[in-house]
Amino acid sequence: MKKELVTAGFALLSLTVPLKASAADFSQFVVFGDSLSDTGNLFNVTQGLPTGPLPPDPPYFQGRFSNDKIWVDYLGDNLGLPPTTITDLIVQLRTTAPEGVNYAFGGSLSGQGNFLNVPGVPGVLEQVGSFTQPFLTNNQKVDPNGLYAVWGGANDYLFTQNPDVTQTVKNVSDSVGLLAQAGAKNILVFNLPDLGKTPLVSATGNTNAFTTLTNNHNAALAAALGQLSNTPGVNIIPVDVDSLFNRVLANPSEFGFTNVTAPCVVGDLVQGVLTSVCNNPNDFLFFDSVHPSSSAHKLVADTALASIRAKSVPERSTALSLLALGVGAAAMLQRKQKNLALTPVASQVVSKHSSRAVVER
C-alpha cells in the first residue's frame, strides 16, 4: 500500500499514513459507453440477426470488440470489481450485481440511439438517463461510493452525417452531469484517440479532417469537464487516451507493437463478412479498422488506473484518526467510495426496480 509521511507542525509528531489509491476500495464499477466499452451487450441483443450476432465470435472475443479482454475487464480485474452486462442481468431476471453493471452497447451514439439502427440499443446519454432517472424522480441518490465511467463520441464522428462537436460534447458532459446530480462522486471520463489515425479513416484520405474533429472534441470536453469539476463533492477523473495513443504511434516498439497502421481483421464487421485475420493480434494497435487490440486496451486500463491514483485520498477513518491527534491539515482529503445503487437501463425490463446493491466487505 502506498504510504505518505504526514507531519503537522508538531515537533514530536510524525505519522506514516496509508494513502490508498481510490481504485483500491470502490464498492462497484459502473460503465456507460459504446463498443470501446461493451463486454457483450450488443452481442446478446443481436443473436437473431441473419448474419449472426455482433461482433462475431470468433475472431472477436466473447462479445467484445477486440481479440481478448478490453479495458473494462482489465480495470475491473484490478479493482476486483468485474461488472456484469445489463443484458445478462435482464436474462437472469436479476436487478442488481454486487460488483457493478456495464451499460455500454456497441454502436451507441453519444446521445440517443445507435448508428446500427438496432431497436432498443440506447445511446450513452440514454444509458445514463435510464440509470439515474428513478433516483432523481424519487429524490434519492445513487450510492456515492462506486466508480462510474463514461466514454462516448467516436461513433458520432465516424458513422453519422454532419457530425456536430458541440452537441456530441454536450451529450457526454450531460451524461457526467446527470451522474453527479444523482449523487455519483467519482466519475472517469475518457477523451478520444486521434480518429484520423484509425485504419478506417486512413483508407479514405480524410485523416486531417478527423484529426481536427478529434482535437476539437477533446478540447471542448476538457473545458466542459473543467466546469463540472467545480461541482462540490464530485471527483471528475479525466483519462487522456489521446495522449496515450499518440505516444504509441510515435514509439510503437516501446509498447510492444509491430504494426500501428493496419488492422489485424480485414472485412465488413457490420455485414459479418471478414476476409482475413492475422495470427498475432496483440502485435497490432488496431484489431479491426476502428477498435483497439486487447494489448492496446490494457494500456487504456493502465492509464485509467494511473488517473485514478493521481487523485488518491485516505479513507475517512484515517482522516478522523489524524484529526484526533491534532493533525488537522492532513485530514483534508476526501473519503474513498464504496457501494453503488444499480437501476436498469434497457427495454424497461427492470425499470420498476430501484433497489440498492450493497457490498459487504
Descriptions of predicted regions:
Residues 10-11, 21:
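Cleavable N-terminal signal peptides
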Residues 4, 8, 24-26:
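Membrane-cytosol interface segments of multi-pass membrane proteins
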Residues 21-314, 361:
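Conserved active-site regions of diverse hydrolases
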Residues 330-361:
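C-terminal membrane-anchoring or membrane-association module
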Residues 1-6, 317:
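Bacterial N-terminal signal peptides that target proteins for export
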Residues 315-333:
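A short, hydrophobic C-terminal helix/tail in secreted or cell-surface proteins
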